[in-house]
Amino acid sequence: MTLDTAEKQKLIESHQVHATDTGSVEVQVAMLSERISKLSDHLQGNIHDYASRQGLLKMIGKRKRLLSYIKGKNPQNYQDLIKKIGIRG
């Protein structure tokens, strides 16, 4: 499941670090989280879509690696990001 341009722009604006930021780790995690959410909804109704399930697992793994990177570099940013996105309780 892809995000349209307006959704991407909204995510970038809400998570960017500076005015021209489009690829920081925070923005990447926010976009991945949104795509994971959309794909999870898709898989609720299409339980035999194994290719999408595989893509979902890859996205979850990538998000996990990016989050561990943030946690190592700046634990406060990590805490702020997971609260802002609403993952991990």
Curated annotation (Swiss-Prot):
One of its GO terms (biological process) is translation. It comes from the Bacteria. Pfam families: Ribosomal_S15 (PF00312). One of its GO terms (molecular function) is rRNA binding. Keywords: Ribonucleoprotein, Ribosomal protein, RNA-binding, rRNA-binding. The keyword Metal-binding does not apply. InterPro entries: Ribosomal_uS15 (IPR000589), Ribosomal_uS15_bac-type (IPR005290), uS15_NS1_RNA-bd_sf (IPR009068). GO terms for cellular component: cytosolic small ribosomal subunit. SUPFAM superfamilies: S15/NS1 RNA-binding domain. The keyword Plastid does not apply. Part of the 30S ribosomal subunit. Forms a bridge to the 50S subunit in the 70S ribosome, contacting the 23S rRNA. NCBIfam families: S15_bact (TIGR00952). One of the primary rRNA binding proteins, it binds directly to 16S rRNA where it helps nucleate assembly of the platform of the 30S subunit by binding and bridging several RNA helices of the 16S rRNA. This is Small ribosomal subunit protein uS15. The lineage of its organism: Bacteria, Bacillati, Cyanobacteriota, Cyanophyceae, Synechococcales.
